[in-house]
């Protein structure tokens, strides 16, 4: 269960002139089916992640807006960098390392992989994605929420509510024996039902296009991203899989919204590790 990635070892052996052969699936199924001790560690990691998420979202929503729309806390500018530092310090005190939270405001959030930089602003969606690792157990948490300071624009609220509905629809079908693709298809169904698109934009796509551009989720354990994927061709889920379910919608014109929870697969359903509300205003 503690098998780490073998690529660094493979590289070192090859550099030493040793020929290496191994199956890329080595240890994958053993890693996927989490034991009760592993589930406890993951629940604890997610609990800490939720606490720091609550702190971050409340800090955003209770900040002061300057005349230019930028946010400040106690006279200091609130930026992606300063909020990221606060999150890092909070997690260090709790015994967690943090590779760098995503804090993407406004149009930056239209790129689901953008870490974010610069000032945070009022009346704009701010995607906050935190994925720390426990220094004692080495298991990861992973949670995303979206916060909006001040008045919430109608189009942002509609998009976020759709992402949340898609998340819970996906969770409802998540159980052992169902494929990761089937879970993703349920997410897509809800996204389309509410008038949004899915898939990467084309060369002629308008800036107003609002779509989900990534899979529904991924496995979590000793690494924050590990098998299985909840996406096209996603494999059959097994008892003990721990997954993120994280629908999002992204629009170049105004940014993005995303909500992410962590679940453990059971025989007939899944267990959610999350208690945080799904709200834009904290």
Where in this protein do the model-derived segments appear?
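Active-site neighborhoods and metal-handling regions in enzymes and metal-associated proteins
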Residues: 1-282
């Amino acid at each position: 269960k503690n098998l780490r990635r073998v690529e660094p070892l493979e590289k070192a052996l090859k550099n030493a002139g040793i020929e290496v052969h191994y199956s890329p699936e080595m240890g994958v199924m053993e890693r996927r089916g989490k034991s009760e001790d592993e589930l406890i560690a993951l629940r604890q990691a997610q609990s800490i992640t939720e606490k720091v998420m609550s702190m971050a979202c409340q800090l955003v929503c209770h900040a002061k807006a300057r005349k230019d729309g930028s946010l400040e806390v106690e006279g200091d500018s609130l930026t992606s960098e300063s909020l990221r530092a606060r999150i890092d310090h909070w997690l260090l005190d709790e015994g967690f390392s943090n590779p760098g939270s995503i804090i993407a405001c406004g149009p930056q959030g239209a790129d689901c992989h953008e870490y974010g930089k610069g000032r945070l602003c009022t009346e704009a969606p701010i995607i906050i994605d935190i994925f720390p690792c426990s220094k004692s157990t080495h298991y990861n948490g992973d949670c995303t929420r979206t916060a909006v300071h001040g008045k919430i624009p109608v189009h942002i609220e509609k998009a976020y509510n759709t992402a949340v509905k898609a998340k819970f629809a996906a969770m409802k079908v998540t159980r052992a024996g169902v494929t990761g693709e089937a879970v993703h298809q349920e997410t897509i169904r809800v996204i389309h039902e509410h008038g949004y698109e899915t898939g990467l934009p084309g060369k002629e796509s308008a800036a107003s296009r609002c779509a989900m551009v990534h899979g529904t989720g991924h496995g979590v354990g000793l690494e924050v991203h590990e098998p299985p994927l909840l996406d096209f061709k996603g494999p059959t889920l097994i008892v003990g899989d721990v997954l993120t379910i994280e629908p999002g919608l992204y629009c170049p014109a105004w940014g993005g919204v995303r909500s992410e929870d962590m679940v453990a697969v059971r025989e007939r359903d899944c267990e959610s590790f999350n208690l945080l509300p799904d709200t834009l205003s904290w």
